Amino acid sequence: MIKLNHVSFSYQNGEANEMQVLSDVSFQASRGECVVLCGKSGCGKTTMLRLVNGLIPHFYTGKLEGNVLVGGQEMQQTPLSQTSRIVGSVFQNPRTQFFHLDTTGEMAFNLENQNVPRPQMKKRLEEVSYRLNLQELMDRNIFELSGGEKQQIACGSVYAALPSVIVMDEPSSNLDMESIRKLQKLIRMMKDEGRTVLISEHRLWYLEGIADRYVLLEDGRIRQKFTPEAAADLSLEKRKALGLRAVKREQLYELRPDMGLIKQKSTGLEIDGLQFSRQMRQVLNVPHLEIPSGAIVAVIGENGAGKSTFSLCLAGLLKHTGTVRIDGKKIAHKKLPEQVYLVMQEAGHQLFSDTVLGELTLNNPALSEEKGKEVLTTLGLNGMENRHPGSLSGGQQQRLSLGTALCMKRKLMLYDEPTSGQDGENLLRTAELIRAANKQAASTLIVTHDPELILRCATHILHIHAGEVKKFIPLDARGVIYMKKVFGEDAQTKKPQKTGIPRLLEFTGRHRPLLGAAQLLSGISALFLLGPFVCVYFAARALLTGLTGGGF
């Protein structure tokens, strides 16, 4: 279904010496197969997806060698209008693929472009919303959805169009555990229906029992291929060396929290009567909350619970009621941006400079070029000083925003999904950066669904549910148990053993042409088997007609 033959590609960015992103890559994926592209940030995973969905070379220009075939069609020669009927795409940032203001319109957009009749379109949307459990998200304003809810709508929109191939770029990056379970169900469903699924991903554990192969890229080349069994057997040290994160669910909890981080017992952040409403509806209510000085608090909860809204209120970006005290001093709402720094979920929204180095010095004119390069080395961005921030991968942009936060030295540090798009190596680097920045701050809050990050740097858990604080506890042994409960650790996520009709559906999805031929042969065989009975029937009819003189 997908075939890349000796493909090399470099983006056209106006520089004399363009960096080769992919070098002599050969790859193929069959019908009904789920293949996972993994590797460090910037290794070429997203570029491979762009080759498959036709965005390269029709949208992203550059030097392309080799050929890319999808469903027997050469992508270089196939217009995007035709490619979109074959390949569906879920991008790393779902906002970049939205064209409507409401969720129902967005779900129907692909079907409208394919001229699907309205009655059939309505029936298809009802079916998709039911199968993917999206009923509560229909007829909603897209701008009021959380990042995870937007990702669910993007997945539903693609699935509704029934493409033969689906490419997904970090589909789990902003999802809570319940939404990840829905994503697992969706991927299994697409496999069972015979669709080819190609996923670029750092969070690998949820694909256990789903992925058929893991392809590891390094510096634009395919370094290694793993079977599911071989990937699951990789040790922690080997995964670190390859830049991979947990491959199995139980590997998420290999580490234990470090309770030696807090040196003080004074209050770093105090909140009283914080409330926020949207369209006459209260979405956040925090009557009272005290966070110790030096604490690194993991803010957890389901998508849409109010976690990001909470961080935006503390950063002074949303007008709210109530008081906020940092180190015992009451901070007026308009003064919050001077005391608080927020690394947003979509890092590209905070990058304004023409160069990577310029991004660090934009709000820090006193920062020397030498010091700025040292920070970039700490971020793993050395050698990229003069690149445009927009040319970085999603994970690299995230780390650049973290570096900017480190240079700002604010009293309260807020991070919204800081490990979105981060590989195993940079997950560790992110945890170290957060701990380093926390040494200069009163407190730190991290909005995250990532237990790997939490166990590497957090000291407390703050559980927000339906806009209210449900629990605030230290991340000790009891805290880990509570976190696992919130994350639905007891829920069944492994692939169930298929029997009966589901097993038959999976087989028919993968071997549809073979079964079609078998059906044809069965039909012909049935005709031959019926032949003698037909002859007996007509002979008996003739005999009876003769005996009755033609009256039968």
Question: Positions of the model-derived regions?
Answer:
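H-loop/switch region of ABC-family ATPase nucleotide-binding domains
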Residues: 201-202, 448-449
